Amino acid sequence: GAFVSLFLEALADGAVTCGLPRDKARRYAAQMVLGTAQLALQSGQHTAAMKDAVCSPGGTTIAGVRALERGGFRSAAMKAVIAAYEKTLALKS
């Protein structure tokens, strides 16, 4: 929950920066995450295939993906999971 909430907040903040009203930005971000999660669960597709299916060559989505990669998004997400796991282990001992 917290990781996805932070991602939703960041998506909405980006949209607000581009001029979208806050209420619409939050709703659109939530709809995007919900729709993608539903597709992942229902289709059984690998998430890489889902990403590739919506990234047109030279398009807007791949530009956004590139920005996420440059910012270390994937690494930060992995580090968050590992940190939470390590904290769980520490609390058990």
Give the residues covered by each predicted segment:
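A short glycine-threonine-serine/GTX helix/turn-capping micro-motif
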Residues: 1-2, 23, 51
